[in-house]
Amino acid sequence: MKILVTGGGGFLGQALCRGLVERGHQVLAFNRSHYPELQVMGVGQIRGDLADPQAVLHAVAGVDAVFHNGAKAGAWGSYDSYHQANVIGTDNVIAACRAHGIGRLVYTSTPSVTHRATHPVEGLGADEVPYGEDFQAPYAATKAIAEQRVLAANDASLATVALRPRLIWGPGDQQLVPRLAERARQGRLRLVGDGSNKVDTTYIDNAALAHFLAFEALAPGAACAGKAYFISNGEPLPMRELVNQLLAAVGAPRVDKAISFKTAYRIGAICERLWPLLRLRGEPPLTRFLAEQLCTPHWYSMEPARRDFGYVPQVSIEEGLRRLKASSAA
């Protein structure tokens, strides 16, 4: 089968491409840049922007299914830039699937679409948690819009499903763990609150596996068609324990210092005002959204994913940490 993966050059995107090739599929990746890693895998590459409808239409031509993983992620930036990539880009993918008669669309979403300030989510499935309101971050806001459009597009000719993997980590990660480690080594990392809030994470192989299983089960009228699912390792840990285990795996110093949520929230608000005012580059070290995320319990039920497409995490956190440590030492 010929499959297109949008955002195939990213951390999860490369895992999806690699796994699909291993499963015997012909894989194309749609990215804004060329990735030598994909070339080594034997993955075809098409360069373009998700916000360009003609580029997306061209990329989708001739494929049998689409994994729409491409997105603008992050905790900072203009709403329009996120809207163009995440909402308009998703609209373009759906339209291209319609135009070319594609039958299956697997969408990579995020648990952040249900973010509601410091309201906890503990042990619930996606159908038990409403979408968020008054988002403090354009990423979460635009991903929520995009997810709803993907699910609304599900019908007899195009089967769709949305997966919400939580905090993906593992060897090859260039974002989550490297940023934590850098700040820890600089003595700039702090916990928000007492660090007792339990959170879910997802080892990279498990995140990819969930996509493959959902894809294989997806068809018009299938149990997973038109639905969203939280995805994780199903092993929630207190934030303090999680962060320090990840830091230890990459040889970074542990973090014990903490600031209160109120202090973190105020710092985030100040950063959000100063960054555009002073025209500072990059992302601020803290935002209101991040402050809320870092102190709030977020862990989910894997039962819906197990029931509807057989998802059972294959790599435990303990084994994932061992693999991360080995890759860091290599």
UniProtKB/Swiss-Prot annotation:
Residues binding NADP(+), per UniProt: 143
Reaction equations catalysed: a (2R,3S)-2-alkyl-3-hydroxyalkanoate + NADP(+) = an (R)-2-alkyl-3-oxoalkanoate + NADPH + H(+)
Alphabetized Pfam families for the sequence: 3Beta_HSD (PF01073)
GO MF annotation terms: oxidoreductase activity, acting on the CH-OH group of donors, NAD or NADP as acceptor
Entry keywords, A to Z: NADP, Oxidoreductase
Catalytic residues (UniProt): 139
EC number of this enzyme: 1.1.1.412
GO biological process: steroid biosynthetic process
Top-level taxon of the source organism: Bacteria
Subunit structure, as described in the record: Homodimer.
Family designation: Belongs to the 3-beta-HSD family.
Purpose: Involved in olefin biosynthesis. Catalyzes the reversible stereospecific NADPH-dependent reduction of 2-alkyl-3-oxoalkanoic acids to 2-alkyl-3-hydroxyalkanoic acids. In the oxidative direction, syn-2-decyl-3-hydroxytetradecanoic acid is the preferred substrate. In the reductive direction, (2R/S)-2-hexyl-3-ketodecanoic acid is accepted as substrate.
Name recorded for this polypeptide: 2-alkyl-3-oxoalkanoate reductase
Organism: Stenotrophomonas maltophilia (strain K279a)
